[in-house]
Amino acid sequence: MNSLEKKQITYGQRLKIAFQYAMPQIYLTQIAGWFANKRWGAVTHFVIKMFAKKYNVHMAEAAKPNFSDYATFNEFFIRQLKEYARPINQNTDALCLPADGKISQCGHIDDELLLQAKGHSFSLRDLLAGDEELTRLFKDGEFVTTYLSPRDYHRVHMPCNGTIRKMIYVPGELFSVNPFLNTHIPNLLARNERVICLFDTDFGPMVQILVGATITASISTVWEGVINPPRTGDIRTWTYEGQSAVSLAKGQEMGAFQLGSTVINLFPKNAVKLADYLQVDTVTRVGEILAYKK
């Protein structure tokens, strides 16, 4: 962080950064998860209504648009959308965006470095938990990082047809991943808890990473269910062959966050060309074009 950046940080902002390091991340996340799963009837519906109002959640596109349709806060948070709310681009040479949100960063992986925020990079090897094979596959490739805010739809979809080959759960920190902290906490995305999913696709190997954050109670995939909790502190790896290797179609749901976070996509060198319109803060919607086959 240079001296100019330091001068621009207010005292209140410094406290926000310090709080991220000092707070009991796991305990807060466990407490939030417990409350979010409680069935409290009218109280739950009131909390959902206040949350939707505060964050301007667009309920008209939800499959269940009434607050009273949700028995728990988590049911609301991972709400499904109406059937045609997110049309999937059908161009067979194009990949589609996996999540609603905003582009945090995107572009070329410079050797083994990805851009986290302006002036701040982090290591591909660290992001992939030191996995040598994956690091080699995606070195000098392309990446897209999508931030999901509290108001966004929190189910994650497939950019293209793919077959799961490997999944790695990486324990880690639970820093908030909002844009301010993403700029001021070094290596944040490579330090946070995450689930790394490697797929075989018609575009070559693709990684889709679901990154946890403060009060992200759980991350789930459609083929394994809830990955965390438990949080044992150990890296866990799944490999898939034969009938255990689930295939998913372009646009199909592949996972979800119970309280939100970030999705990172990785592509090998010379595999895809990212869509020209993608840049920092571009609003994303599931099904819109992410990249084209080279």
Swiss-Prot record:
Needed cofactors: pyruvate
Quaternary structure note: Heterodimer of a large membrane-associated beta subunit and a small pyruvoyl-containing alpha subunit.
Localization per record: Cell membrane
Protein name as annotated: Phosphatidylserine decarboxylase proenzyme
Cell membrane found in the keyword field: yes
Membrane topology: Peripheral membrane protein
GO terms for biological process, alphabetical: phosphatidylethanolamine biosynthetic process
Gene Ontology CC: one annotated term: plasma membrane
UniProt modified residues of type Pyruvic acid (Ser): 261
Pathway(s) where this gene product acts: Phospholipid metabolism; phosphatidylethanolamine biosynthesis; phosphatidylethanolamine from CDP-diacylglycerol: step 2/2
Species assigned in the record: Mannheimia succiniciproducens (strain KCTC 0769BP / MBEL55E)
Family the UniProt entry places it in: Belongs to the phosphatidylserine decarboxylase family. PSD-B subfamily. Prokaryotic type I sub-subfamily.
Alphabetic keyword roster: Cell membrane, Decarboxylase, Lipid biosynthesis, Lipid metabolism, Lyase, Membrane, Phospholipid biosynthesis, Phospholipid metabolism, Pyruvate, Zymogen
Primary site of residence: membrane
Residue positions of the active site: 100, 157, 261
Reactions catalysed, as given in the entry: a 1,2-diacyl-sn-glycero-3-phospho-L-serine + H(+) = a 1,2-diacyl-sn-glycero-3-phosphoethanolamine + CO2
Taxonomic lineage of the native organism: Bacteria, Pseudomonadati, Pseudomonadota, Gammaproteobacteria, Pasteurellales
